[in-house]
Each structure stands twice: as structure tokens, then as C-alpha cells.
Amino acid sequence: MSTDAGPPATINGTENLPTKQWTRVLEALFSESVLAKVWHVASKAIGSTTPPTLYPEYTGSDKSTYIYRTLDFWTSGFFPGSLYLLLERNTLLRERHATPHSTQANLRPHPLQHEHLCRWWTANLHQNALRKDTHDLGFMIAPWAIKAWTLHRDPAAYNTLILAAHSLASRFNESTQCIRSWDECITKRYAYKDPSQDYLVIIDNMLNLDILFWVARETNCRRLYDIAKAHAITTQKHHIRDDYATFHVVNLDPDTGEVKDKFTNQGYSDSSCWARGQAWGILGFMQTYEWTKERGFLCTARALADVFLDRLPDDGVPYWDFDAPVTDTEPRDTSAAMIAACGMLLLYKAYKGLRDREIADHYLHAAMRLVDCTVKGYLNPPVRFEAGPASVVSVYADQHSTHQTERQNLVEALKVVGDEHAAETILTGATINNYEFAPRRWSNHGLIYADYYFLLFGNMLLEMGLVDSLMHR
């Protein structure tokens, strides 16, 4: 635990958590800057006559400005998912009467305009639900479509979820008892090009099971439930080593289900422990436990979390791979930290429900420390909202002339202000891929899913009643 923790704060009457740590984390999670950064990017689409087809992924060479990907790329759902998380947050704060002091500013987008941008940014994503050439439909659809349904009962989003789940299920193979991840995989070291010979499954795919479980419950479809559970069991069997570190990729024989190879595509080596892969495993197995309540999945998630925590450096932010040589320039991965933190919050929730407060509190402390250490080292400088001047427009008048008039009864325009070179992402220090044989290497940048899971962590704290407990201590 960090030495600047300060005196303990009592949460829900039992957890004793460092006050300074909680305060720093909550100020970052619920700051005006968080909303302003997302709004700055989202509002660029307000004046367009057509919905977006390009979606933010990572920051470029300037470490500040987003590089965009096409709507069919696997990360397309995270930015609109972030918009929906912030829209949901307004409801959670209101319902729980939790008002962190950093969110009290009146300058914020109107909820209806916020809702419009949520729908606008997702208008072109519904078509992805029909794709059967990718395992990433959970990432591409669930972050925004589940919120669109739960918040607004959006029937289009509901239909998209159902279509996406069945499209994803079409990639399940009875012989392998899992969902195919990649049809092909090509690096400077190897090339898998024939799906009839190779059945590639990655640890990341655990996060795509949630959409199957969700639709299975909504539509009473046992087949979707069974497919999701079978995939989790197969991943337990093949992706997890005896020491509970994880393999990234497992190649199975598509006819027999026998293991042909185990290797990495984004880690340091085939035998190393890629940090984000370990994090995907923690959160994925916890989501599976939440749906099935089978203790084996909980135990697996806990074991993976313990490896993650045991291998953290002293400053609490994971290197991109736990087995990569440690140097002054070795990249970190803040996305791995945020994904793992969300998984550990679910561990807290699970063990609290099982009435094991000691274990529950351990993982709550661990999750908070992960976020706190990330905030201390990798939170980008803040931006803020500022009201623009009274709006003046040109109005057509007789004799082909115009005159100026102030708009009446309208909220002043909001603009986002900050340092001239302020980053568009909330966090920096992420690493997409630093594998030496990768076609391209990315490290030390902002990343949309690092920010998404940072925002999700805040909403999870609200849902668990932890934020208002601290605010009213």
C-alpha cells in the first residue's frame, strides 16, 4: 500500500480504506475533466449530416490526438460505450444522492443532447450485429447496446443485441467446445492462414461471453448460455498454466479439439504472461461467475488476480508483460490495470455476497490501489467546460439584408478548454502491442478501452454504493 495513504475511512461500516487514496481516485473518476474530454471528441459529430463511421482508438505520435478506426474494427464500441457510461452516471448519482465535489459544476451538456450523441455515435454500429467473421461482437456491441436498452428501452439496440449474440454463437464448434477467435493470424514469425486446419482461440474472447449470457437470459435461450459456459470451461482447460499465468493464443485442431500450439501474439514471448491477457482473464471469468454462480469460475478469477497483483512493480502499474525485461523505457499498460481493477471489484462483490469480508476487502483495496497508482502516474492534464458568449446569429430580413440578434432562452454554448496540447484521452501509458514480431508495435499512448474501463470502474463503485458511503463519511 502506498505510504501516503492517510488515515482510514470507514466504508459501509466495515471496510477500512485509506482516505487519501479514495479521495484521489474519486476526484479523478468523477472530475469535470472526464466528461469534458469525452464530450470534446463526441461533440465534433454534432454538426455532421451523417452519423460517424470512424471511431477513436488510440493517440498518435503527439500522444494527444486520437487516431480513428473504421466502424468494423473491434474497438468501435468503446467510445459510444463511454458516452453511455457517462449518461448512466448521471442517473446513478441522482438515485444514490452521491455528489462527489468535483462533479458539482453546473456546466455540463444537456441530458437530451447527451442522449442524442449516444444514439448518433451508434447509428452505424447496428450493422455489425450481422457479422459472422469476428469473435469481437461483444466488444463491438455490448458496451453501448446494453446501456441503450437498460436506460431507454431502445428496441433497435435490443434487436441488435439478439442478432449479435446469435452471430457470435455461429462461430462455436462442437468439437473444440469453444468459439473461434481469429480466422487468420500473421506476424513476422508465423502465419496461420487456413481455418480448416487451425482453430485459434485467444484469452480476450472471455469478454465476449457476456453478450451471450445477457441475450440467453433475455430470450430464455439455453443454447446461448451453454455455448458461453462451454467456452469458459475450454479456456480454463487450455489457456491457464499451472501457476495461473495465462497463454494468449491456443491453436486447436478444428476436427478433434486437440491442442496444436500455444503462443503469443501481443506478449513478450510464448511462455510469458502478457499483462492485458491476464486482466482479460480476471474480468472474463468474473463475468462468467456472475452469470453462472459456479465457484470454479470464481476460484479461477481469484487465482489469476493473485498472479496479477503479485507481479506488479513497486509503483503499482503493470508493465505490458510481466516477464519482459525491466528497463527505464519498458512500456507499461494502463489498459491492463483498468481491466484488472474492474475484475477485482467483481471479486469484492462476490466475496461480500458470500459473507467473506476479509477476502472481499482485500480485492477492494487491490482494485483501488491499481486505479490510484495509475491516476498518480498516468492521468492526463485536465480540461474543463466553459460557457461561450451569448449566441449571436444572422437572421434573413426583407430587402435581402441581414441583422444580428441574440438567441433567447437558450443555454449558452459549452466549449472544452485546457492546455493547448491537452490530450483527448483521460489516461496515457497504454500499450496496444509490443510483441517484437508484430506487424506493427504501439506503446506509451492513450487508448480508448483504457478510458472505457476507467469510466466503468467509477460506475461500478456507484452501483455498489461505495461512492456515497465515502462522500457521507
Name each model-derived stretch.
Residues 1-76, 81, 85-89, 100-101, ...:
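Low-complexity, Ser/Thr/Pro/Gly-enriched N-terminal "stalk/linker" regions
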Residues 60-66, 118-130, 182-195, 260-269, ...:
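Acidic/His metal-coordination segments adjacent to aromatic residues that form catalytic metal sites
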Residues 17-31, 86-115, 149-162, 216-229, ...:
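Structural helix-adjacent loops and short alpha-helical linkers that scaffold large soluble proteins
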Residues 2-11, 72-87, 133-150, 199-217, ...:
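Well-ordered alpha-helical segments within folded domains of soluble proteins
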Residues 169-221, 225, 248-280, 284, ...:
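The feature captures the catalytic groove of carbohydrate-active enzymes
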Residues 26-30, 34-61, 68-73, 96, ...:
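CBM-like carbohydrate-recognition segments
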Residues 31-50, 104-132, 161-193, 228-261, ...:
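Long, well-ordered core segments of solenoidal/helical folds
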Residues 114, 119, 271-317, 325-333, ...:
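Long, repeat-rich segments with strong aromatic
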